[in-house]
């Protein structure tokens, strides 16, 4: 919420398949903004169109930073998946995505409730 300068929701996500290493430093070597990399891109993203996809409700993302400017062309979207947990499991790795920030199904339902009637929502994707 920009008016009170605080996050409305914060939750763990599964990242791209190359970004799940056993310690944080190595994860930064496995980020990419390149098409076909199947790696995560960090930075701020505008939450765009809602749609029903392969994994249920999903939202297209438009990258706002140079580190994630290709999110839309890479088809990186925000979605839920049953193999992602609602709680941090670090230092163990989660099952990776092809670059999408993936929430647990439960958390995605909560996020969807917040996003359904909003516009101009920005998320911050980080490791």
What label would you give each PLM region?
Residues 1-98, 105-122, 127:
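Cell wall/extracellular polymer interaction/catalysis modules
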């Amino acid at each position: 919420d920009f008016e009170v300068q605080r996050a409305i929701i914060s939750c763990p996500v599964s990242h791209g398949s190359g970004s799940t290493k056993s310690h944080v430093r190595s994860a930064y070597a496995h980020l990419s903004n390149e098409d076909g990399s199947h790696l995560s891109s960090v930075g701020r993203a505008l939450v765009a169109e809602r749609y029903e996809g392969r994994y249920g409700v999903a939202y297209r993302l438009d990258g706002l930073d140079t580190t994630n400017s290709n999110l839309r062309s890479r088809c990186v979207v925000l979605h839920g998946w049953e193999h992602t947990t609602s709680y941090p499991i670090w230092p163990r790795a989660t099952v990776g995505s092809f670059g999408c920030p993936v929430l647990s199904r439960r958390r995605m339902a909560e996020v969807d409730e917040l996003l359904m009637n909003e516009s101009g929502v920005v998320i911050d994707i980080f490791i």
